[in-house]
Regions:
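Histidine/acidic residue-rich metal-binding segments in metalloenzymes
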Residues: 148-167, 174-238, 244-264, 275-289, ...
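Active-site microenvironment of metallo-dependent hydrolases
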Residues: 1-38, 42-43, 51, 92-94, ...
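Short acidic, glycine/serine/threonine-rich loops at helix termini
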Residues: 110-114, 140-146, 177-181, 205-209, ...
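Active-site beta-loop-alpha junctions enriched in small/polar residues
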Residues: 76-78, 104-106, 134-139, 169-172, ...
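Metal-associated gating/positioning segment near the N- to mid-region
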Residues: 53-56, 61-121, 464
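Residue-level marker for buried hydrophobic side chains located in beta-strands
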Residues: 21, 69-71, 131, 264, ...
Length: 569
């Protein structure tokens, strides 16, 4: 609890004028789901009271809806490709003033120092960054990360560095089976939250996962999964990101049964969509369009995530809360016409106010993180196999981070070569295989964003030039110090440099978004790619904790059985 502020109390009593009076609006009261015609009196950063009173500044919103600001229930900053200050500049105009962030991408590259560097950079910004302690670094033993965290590191992040809980427990087999190390990481949360990650986990397995102390899940893809979780008291974060778009499949249960134990999250969001469509307000718009009443949408987008994550200063506009206020001339647009953060106007008309967000210097340890040793050649990335050979292939599912374990004949339509190159210690370790679902006809796509260990992942066409283009793409990433590239005919067609841990840019959000658009356009044009977000999909084919089949620097992994499998059948 924050210490009482005598100035706020004086304004609340009416003894002193408010610093700001927002009048003429309808204030949303989450507890009663009412719209109350009243004014908000703000003292400094805090809502001091409701009702008309003297104030140094008055803003008449002309009948607008006044709501708490949006909170993202679960996200990874690194997936936006933006450094922390640019992310805040991007989302404030859309009404988001708080996130629950799991920086396990940074942790996989740089360990605890990467996490604490992010915390320090975010602290001065006009934003609430709730940072969780990554629990599974590396995500599994099947891949080579740049760092490893055990229960002592997790505990230190919570107890010494202010992490607000333990982040998603991706090693759900370990938790369910009672692995002592995983249970020790869970226990490190103490009285704070322990987030989950349980794709496809149901029945007794889910019972065990919950009995261990896990409290939430954002991996539901089917309504039946979400219903079972809520029935058993588990929070469900309904995800609508760039690759995983699960809201349409899950929101009907909220329409039918109400919003209890549910909240909205983005998980992984690309910068182009972030600037174009919005952030949590985009999720809110989709939920409302699916039939969720506006009042319940606000619970999902504002109040519930704030309550779950312990953001007690956010989530409603009662006296004593932080004055993170959104004004909607038309609530149905879900685009706020004004955004106040801690009592200060930070955006109006969808545009950030000048000087609203200070620069956050980039720590030097985030640069120079791509270490390949000798750059692998075409033969190392794409071993020759005879046409007609039966092989396993990672089957990409558009708009999902799940994959299929495909068994195909080499040479079939819509196949691509695939490889993952270790990039943290220059070991030269390369895992090779095949992928389907990209529609790749020519060239190669490569990325140092490769969940969760973030090695170099590359796919190349099955034609004679594919291996050469794969080698060119990997070499270019080494030159850039990280990023994403499209190569065709031995030349770079487009690229997005990501020099910060190989995950994020140091450039303005609009520039990064434009580069991402150009990269996707090159992939769809010159290379023939048919899926909507090819680089987001590419980044997930190495994720060795979500079924079914994945490729890592150690080869193919069958996640259903948690074991390595050979390429050839």
């Amino acid at each position: 609890m924050r210490a009482p502020d005598p100035r706020v109390l004086a304004v609340a009593r009416g003894d002193e004028p408010a610093d700001l009076l927002i009048t003429g609006g309808r204030v949303f009261a989450p507890a009663t789901r009412e719209w109350v015609p009243t004014a908000l009196a703000i003292a400094g950063s805090t809502v001091a009271g409701w009702g008309e009173r003297d104030a140094r500044a008055v803003v008449d919103v002309g009948g607008a809806a006044l709501t708490p600001a949006f909170v993202d229930a679960h996200m990874h900053l690194e997936s936006t490709k933006l450094w922390v200050d640019e992310f805040v500049r991007a989302v404030l105009p859309h009404g988001t003033t708080a996130v629950a962030a799991d920086p396990h991408e940074l942790a996989n590259v740089l360990g605890v120092p990467g996490v604490t560097a992010l915390m320090a950079a975010a602290a001065p910004l006009p934003f609430t960054f709730g940072v969780y302690a990554p629990s599974c670094v590396p995500a599994s033993a099947f891949e080579s990360a740049g760092a490893a965290l055990d229960h002592r590191d997790v505990r230190a992040l919570v107890e010494q560095h202010g992490a607000i809980g333990v982040a998603e427990l991706m090693n759900f087999p370990g938790v369910i089976g009672g692995d002592p190390e995983m249970l020790a990481r869970l226990a490190a949360a103490g009285d704070r939250r322990a987030d989950g990650h349980a794709p496809g986990v149901v029945g007794r397995a889910l019972d065990a996962y919950l009995a261990a102390g896990v409290e939430s899940d954002h991996e539901c893809t089917r309504a039946e999964e979400a219903l079972e979780r809520r029935r058993k008291g588990m929070w469900v974060f309904i995800r609508e990101g760039s690759a995983s778009r699960n809201l349409a499949a899950l929101i009907g249960d909220v329409v039918e049964r109400g919003p209890a134990l549910a909240a909205l999250c983005t998980d992984d969001r690309e910068p182009d969509g972030l600037l174009r469509d919005g952030h949590i307000n985009h999720c809110a718009r989709l939920a409302a369009a699916a039939g969720v009443p506006d009042e319940d949408v606000l619970l999902l987008a504002c109040t519930h995530p704030a309550r779950y994550h312990g953001f007690t200063h956010l989530g409603d506009l009662g006296p004593g809360r932080q004055a993170d206020v959104l004004s909607f001339a038309e609530l149905g647009s879900w685009r706020p016409d004004r955004v106040w953060q801690a009592g200060r106007l930070v955006a109006a008309g969808g545009v950030l106010e000048p000087g609203a967000v200070p620069d956050a210097p980039v720590p030097g340890l985030l640069r120079g993180t791509v270490h390949l040793g000798a750059t692998p050649d075409a033969a190392a990335l794409a071993p020759e196999r005879a046409a007609g050979t039966r092989v396993r292939a990672v089957g990409v599912i558009e708009r999902s981070i799940s994959t299929r374990a495909c068994e195909v004949v080499l040479g079939e339509d819509d196949m691509a070569r695939a490889a993952v190159v270790e990039r943290h210690r220059g070991t030269g370790r390369v895992g090779t295989g095949y992928a389907t679902g990209f529609g790749l006809r020519r060239g190669a796509l490569a990325s140092t964003v490769a969940h969760d260990a973030h090695n170099v992942v590359v796919v190349g066409a099955l034609d004679a030039d594919g291996p050469r283009d794969m080698a060119v793409a990997v070499a270019r990433l080494a030159e850039l110090g990280g990023g994403q590239v499209a190569v065709v005919d031995g030349e770079v067609a487009a690229e997005v440099p990501l020099p910060l841990a190989g995950l994020m840019s140091d450039r303005p959000a609009a520039e990064v978004a434009e580069r991402c658009r150009a990269l996707n356009a090159a992939a769809a044009g010159a290379l023939g790619v048919t899926i909507e977000e090819p680089f987001m999909q590419l980044s997930f084919i190495a994720l060795s904790v979500i079924p079914e089949l994945r490729i890592t620097d150690g080869g193919l992994v069958d996640v259903r059985r948690f074991e390595r499998v050979p390429v050839e059948l």
